[in-house]
């Protein structure tokens, strides 16, 4: 019954994630699913952490697995990670954060300016983090369209004019 519930859970997650990200998540899931039964269980996690040189105790591993409301199949794995990837900020909150730097209200910012802010303020992004963040970002003529970007990362697909 639990496995059936896991199969039904959050199938709309497939519509929310870009195809490339979904493929990367599938590869990650397959690497973790050591026994290839289509579900990640405590033994799969033990083997994965062992291969990384870590040995978390069963309590930690059980806590990780409890984030899923049922057995951890690929759909549930995607759902959990898409929630984590999308974070807790709403699309409007993110858009408003970018808008603070958009004095002329053009809905676009100079991409070099944004990169400079991210490299030198707050979390201090590395060059690799920067490349990954802006890999599929809507940038035209050096201008970063933050309205499209926030819609893209939050999965709404809505773009304001």
UniProtKB/Swiss-Prot annotation:
Gene3D superfamilies: EF-hand. The keyword Calcium applies. One of its GO terms (molecular function) is calcium ion binding. InterPro entries: EF-hand-dom_pair, EF_Hand_1_Ca_BS, EF_hand_dom, Myosin_RLC. The keyword Repeat applies. Pfam families: EF-hand_7 (PF13499). Residues 20-55, 89-124 form the EF-hand domain. This is Myosin regulatory light chain A, smooth adductor muscle. Transmembrane segments: none annotated. PROSITE patterns: EF_HAND_1, EF_HAND_2. One of its GO terms (cellular component) is myosin complex. Keywords: Calcium, Metal-binding, Motor protein, Muscle protein, Myosin, Repeat. In molluscan muscle, calcium regulation is associated with myosin rather than with actin. Muscle myosin contains two types of light chains: the catalytic light chain, essential for ATPase activity, and the regulatory light chain, a calcium-binding protein responsible for Ca(2+) dependent binding and Ca(2+) dependent Mg-ATPase activity.
